[in-house]
Amino acid sequence: PPSDGRFHGGTKVFCGLAGTVMRFVPGLAMFADGPVAFDGDEQAYARPMKPVLDGLEQLGACIEYHGEEGRLPFTITPPQTVSQCAEPSVVSIDSSGSSQFISGLLLIGSRVPGGLELHHTGEKTPSLPHIRMTVADLHGSGVRVNADEHARVWTVQPGAVQLPETVTVEPDLSNAAPFLGAALIAGGTVRVPHWPESTTQPGGMLPGYLERMGAEISFPVIDDVRYCEVTGNGHVSGLGDFDLTAAGEIAPSLAAILVFADKPTRMIGIGHLRGHETNRLEALANEITRVGGAAHELPDGLEITPVSANHLRPSVMETYADHRMATFAAMLGLRIKGIQVKNVATTAKTLPNFVDLWNDMLV
């Protein structure tokens, strides 16, 4: 917060479809001098918000819902007075639906009087690497955080945030998934620059996953730039039971590849994808079926069963205003002739120049 400790209230935040905005910014409203309203695209009204808002209520905020409870739109009224506590405030939420609920609360933990002791009550922690990324960033800003991942408890000590003078922001590695995966589907080699030597991003697991599916992986350094290079020959190995809990965001790209695999794959640990930009499990099952493939939802994931190539057919693919469903459809078009992608412009959320990059790759 500013030096006086308070942001300006009496304002409205429009979140669009951005999950990080709708789940990270509400915590800042705890430090406003008045109510802050939050709204977003109509499609965002379907995205779950309740765990992070429950956490803010446990910290003293008042939440007024203007639609369905636990979802946008809503107004947050911060606590009238800030209590001085020697012990951390204990907050318990079920973050099974998104790691962002935990991250959103951890980010404000050091400014909570006495600090924050955050308990995740769910059985699984989705996208744990994202939470580790949050903790690493807090450590880099002088915030003391203790993470007991086995007990699913995070403790943030109170104190000032000391931002470093410079911060290196890694490229979003999950955006590389459609391009690197293209090498497996179509055969050939794809090289993505500026691949970090180490990372906390779930997308950093992508090369290992692609290798299990039959790709050759290397990391050449050319003119001091480190690349991730993937080579495929058009053959895709199915993965059987495949736990993707840690990296569910790349599930659509992996699903596109696995449509052409040599045996079935059951991607599990990704039930939380039902609460993403769209219900991605339902959308993936629908679109794979649309092109003549075989896929069905599982309670916690998606099963894809390969079919012969002559069963796959040209189709007009729905994208559900979801950037990852658009790139998924483009990947299918590498091997299925006659694929058309509705509203490919939805990729602008994360890759405004996706179409140009895709076409350049295929030249």
Name every feature range the model reports, one short phrase each.
Residues P1-V363:
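Short, structured segments at the rim of ligand-binding sites
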